[in-house]
Swiss-Prot record:
<feature type="DNA-binding region" description="H-T-H motif">
    <location>
        <begin position="23"/>
        <end position="42"/>
    </location>
</feature>
<dbReference type="InterPro" id="IPR005119">
    <property type="entry name" value="LysR_subst-bd"/>
</dbReference>
<dbReference type="InterPro" id="IPR036390">
    <property type="entry name" value="WH_DNA-bd_sf"/>
</dbReference>
<dbReference type="GO" id="GO:0003700">
    <property type="term" value="F:DNA-binding transcription factor activity"/>
</dbReference>
<comment type="similarity">
    <text>Belongs to the LysR transcriptional regulatory family.</text>
</comment>
<keyword id="KW-0804">Transcription</keyword>
<dbReference type="InterPro" id="IPR036388">
    <property type="entry name" value="WH-like_DNA-bd_sf"/>
</dbReference>
<comment type="function">
    <text>Positive regulator required for L-tartrate-dependent anaerobic growth on glycerol. Induces expression of the ttdA-ttdB-ygjE operon.</text>
</comment>
<dbReference type="GO" id="GO:0006351">
    <property type="term" value="P:DNA-templated transcription"/>
</dbReference>
<dbReference type="GO" id="GO:0043565">
    <property type="term" value="F:sequence-specific DNA binding"/>
</dbReference>
<keyword id="KW-0805">Transcription regulation</keyword>
<dbReference type="Pfam" id="PF00126">
    <property type="entry name" value="HTH_1"/>
</dbReference>
<protein>
    <recommendedName>
        <fullName>HTH-type transcriptional activator TtdR</fullName>
    </recommendedName>
</protein>
<dbReference type="Pfam" id="PF03466">
    <property type="entry name" value="LysR_substrate"/>
</dbReference>
<feature type="domain" description="HTH lysR-type">
    <location>
        <begin position="6"/>
        <end position="63"/>
    </location>
</feature>
<dbReference type="InterPro" id="IPR000847">
    <property type="entry name" value="Tscrpt_reg_HTH_LysR"/>
</dbReference>
<keyword id="KW-0238">DNA-binding</keyword>
Amino acid sequence: MLNSWPLAKDLQVLVEIVHSGSFSAAAATLGQTPAFVTKRIQILENTLATTLLNRSARGVALTESGQRCYEHALEILTQYQRLVDDVTQIKTRPEGMIRIGCSFGFGRSHIAPAITELMRNYPELQVYFELFDRQIDLVQDNIDLDIRINDEIPDYYIAHLLTKNKRILCAAPEYLQKYPQPQSLQELSRHDCLVTKERDMTHGIWELGNGQEKKSVKVSGHLSSNSGEIVLQWALEGKGIMLRSEWDVLPFLESGKLVQVLPEYAQSANIWAVYREPLYRSMKLRVCVEFLAAWCQQRLGKPDEGYQVM
């Protein structure tokens, strides 16, 4: 049992060091001296009786204990900010511009309606919503919050899981009447595959797993596009086999307009909110992430238990 609890300001110092990459940069962000930052980290390490950071000529790195402390610190500081907002009623209504990015298909079908509802609840917000057919850089593309259908998130971003999702193989019954349904991934090379080149997808390569192994399959066909909506329409018209997100094809599977192919295989493609700064720093960012999480969970299902907004 600890003799004293870690102070919120010391946890904030740790978070700032991780995000800025150095003690001096963290000090500048906090408006303090490097000596102050060093002292607060020493106090935090003494309080927890463990080393949190390793310093070298190449920079600063978290220890295993430091990584755990950092993750909890993000959660604690976000909860602390909620407490301050609720009790003091200061800035309880988020305001100002927030720039949100997303892919075309999911952006139009889910995020755009969610933003409409968001604005009803928080009319003081201003939202600029931009759709991309490529992976973006939050800084270079000037985006505060990016909604990504991709599990490979760079570690210099913060990511919050909105909901689970996977991509599955589908085709129309009309197509499968003309051509024998593939019985293995290798047989996909004999089929007309509708290739999509969206934000995170490598053109002509499908990464598929069955829970035991993952394989890369090279596919081709007469039709390809950077629009998932167009590829879905081609599949419905019986033009070939496609790999699409479950949220996009589920209504057509239920109606019988599409049939799942090789159902034991799928591609993990969870839906994430991705941003640069911890949520405790920005009420408008926190409100947007929490609202979109609730929106997606209500319509697409909740992710696994145990995650936190950070």
